[in-house]
């Protein structure tokens, strides 16, 4: 009986020691998810690109930058957001769910907004979008991220903006062949 009690005490001791790193990792993951959610709320939903420096390191890298942007540094990120907010002044991001592992947070997001301003050399369409995406924020240390990857349903967005026909629409007629002057003299 003494041996059984001793074995149980030792086993419980090992079990509690083993759970401490996991608890610390869970706390870190929870803190990182909260920080990314704050970024979405305070930068994107508040349309406030000036808050970027509070959430990103100076050497931040966006691995999927918008056209015309390098994806390097917070100044480039702020410029990208300013252009995006001008094109979609009512843009809103909803976080559907988040998963954290180590220094990374993966978010399934939905972005809505109306294209009422130009974006680069593309004129405003006046049409609304409602698209899903995956956003991965990484290198989170001391509450600041150093990199990001993002994917969204670009085909759905282009269809909603009128830049592509909807799925199942008849194909466009073939282009007329170029006419050339065969009687060159």
Sequence positions of predicted segments:
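C-terminal motif of bacterial Sec signal peptides marking the signal peptidase cleavage site
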Residues: 14-16
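Positively charged n-region of N-terminal signal peptides that target proteins for export
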Residues: 1-4
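C-terminal and inter-domain tail/linker signature
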Residues: 18-185
């Amino acid at each position: 009986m003494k041996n059984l009690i001793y074995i149980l005490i030792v086993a419980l001791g090992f079990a509690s020691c083993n759970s401490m790193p996991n608890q610390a990792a869970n706390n870190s993951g929870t803190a990182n998810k909260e920080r990314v959610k704050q970024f979405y709320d305070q930068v994107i939903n508040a349309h406030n690109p000036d808050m970027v420096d509070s959430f990103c390191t100076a050497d931040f890298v966006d691995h999927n930058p918008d056209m015309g942007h390098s994806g390097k540094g917070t100044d480039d990120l702020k410029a990208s957001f300013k252009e995006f907010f001008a094109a979609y002044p009512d843009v809103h991001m909803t976080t559907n769910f988040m998963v954290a592992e180590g220094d990374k947070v993966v978010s399934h997001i939905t972005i809505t907004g109306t294209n009422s301003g130009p974006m680069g050399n593309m004129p405003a369409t006046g049409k609304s979008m409602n698209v899903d995406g995956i956003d991965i924020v990484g290198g989170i240390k001391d509450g600041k991220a150093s990199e990001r990857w993002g994917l969204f349903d670009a085909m759905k967005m282009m269809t909603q903006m009128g830049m592509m026909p909807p799925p199942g629409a008849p194909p466009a007629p073939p282009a007329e062949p170029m006419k050339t002057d065969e009687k060159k003299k």
